[in-house]
Amino acid sequence: MRIWLAVVLALPQLAGAQVPHAAIANARIRAALYLPDAQSGYYRGTRFDWSGVVASLEWKGHTYFGQWFARYDPKLHDAIAGPVEEFLTNDAGLGYDEAKPGERFVRIGVGAVLKPDEARYRRFSTYDIVDPGKWTVNRGPDWTEFVHELRDTAGYAYVYRKKLRLVDDTLVLEHRLKNTGRKTIASSVYEHDFFMLDGQPTGPDVVVRFAFEPRATSALNGLAETRGKDFVYLKELEPRQTVQTEIEGFGASPRDYDIRVENRKTGAGVRQSGDRPISKIVFWSIRTTVCPEAYIDLRIEPGKESSWRIAYQFYQVKSGANAKLKKSRAYYD
């Protein structure tokens, strides 16, 4: 355990400087986390929530997250790892449509940013941060809690809590978002998992299993296809190849928020489940990562609070392709 932690804690320094970090572990899972920091954090872009960035995670010799990209820059929109989240309102930041050039709008989990004179929101760009808010990090041996407070920004303000905890074979992400401003917070939020099961390339050994029969809305160009409830790859993706589509077929029940990603070559599996209905799924993958992006919707009136939970249960793939997996108790605790 001590040897492993020493290796994990050295990982953030690979970015070239001292990066704030932490480690959590239980008897089965070991994970390294990057911590939010406006001056020296590993990720300082404005697309994704800064909390809960998982630098690496190991379960019974299998690895699940890591650096999937070739070029690192702390302000790149996607220079990030692990199951991270993005909040969107009308496919933009909160308050973006109301703000005039030179005024502020909100990126939840990032802070208040400046709106330039532009025709439309540039999701993959990095905006100037004018108020990063206040971050507090609380820690235990098998959990870390992030608290982000943002004061009034054009009528929007919040206290956002996100706790990562390990229970048995499961990483649980618990969220609470309290609206402390004058305006309603209406947003969607999705998990961008950046799965890297055992660092293997995306190809026929990888299968993504849904709780429903998925329908791809875009052409998969001979690279992948749906078979029943499975999304499968027909060939190993080359470095410049991408599979991207929206997925339809889910219903209005949280039961459909149940997605498994498996590598049949190495035996690594992960089951992602949520306690809210899915509102949208975007599927994106390249050679180095597989990302089924499940969205949920939030609407929080002033003075009110909303909570939601995502669980990642890690398991060994059995020989039977449809072997049953009992949902971890961590999902219900």
Where are these regions (language model features)?
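Sec-dependent N-terminal signal peptides
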Residues: I3-P12
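Surface-exposed acidic/polar loop and edge beta-strand patches at domain peripheries
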Residues: Q18-V172, T180-A186, H192-D333
